[in-house]
């Protein structure tokens, strides 16, 4: 990738949509522009898990504004990712069809583990080089991601369906902030996160980091109110809980550092964060600067070179996992590559690389059935938790 190349990441979160534009310089990304809009799409899911028309319209309106900034960007310069709300939404295809057209770039609904991997990429690239074993926590609107990693490599990734929007809607729907509601919310969060303890127990990491969303919001409040900046301690969470209980209602919370868009979801977010502190025995949580969107930007850099493209390793792993006939795949790749070069000589290396992956995986569905194997293969690929 050439120095000076502009890259963009669009993060369609459950609470906010974000656009980050950066310039590639000597292996690093310098921020050029950052936009954030509170869309609260996660709050627009009904009991049948369908997005309301109003929630979709808020999202489309935001994407239209982002599209103005991305008009001159080529597809290889942009990665747009959607997370838990669109993973859940039964009518997501309705939103995506129009959203893709408005944005001018394909929106990818990433799996929970892929979201966690990208979060770790974003966090690790903005931390000093270190060999420490890291725990990374990201509490979003409808999901919480946990990652164990070292340097730039994530070793364990997991995503749980508990977040600030869902917990606020479930336990603080009327805005009332009571001790009983917090007890119920924390107990429910621990029940959802309990299985994480086997993998993310304290002896497996040396330092804990929190990124984006709730962690950033809580850290800003604590710092603005005189607590140590850049780190969250349990006593800080206890102090914040008392302030919320004293206020009694979200509309009456008066705290420096609390932004208006965080006010309706601060109860749910704090209860999940407190549950994690208890469950994983966290005594201090360092606030990371990177998050999902930075991870998507650095992933674009990796994708620009065949040697670092995570998707190549993923394809090789899938071919081995499903016992694809390697010799046959290679013959298909050569034949398809020859025809492709003759038919579209102007096509670039990216398209040829994707065709090669398709050749490696085109018979993957035969592990399920010979009849209609291409449809089985498509289903397996679409529903596998795979990196990249």
Indicate where each model-derived feature is located.
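A generic beta-sheet turn/junction motif
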Residues: 12-14, 139-141, 150
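Helical "lid/coupling" subdomains associated with nucleotide-phosphate turnover
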Residues: 2-7, 24, 40, 44-73, ...
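Conserved beta-strand/loop subsegment of P-loop NTPase cores
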Residues: 77-80
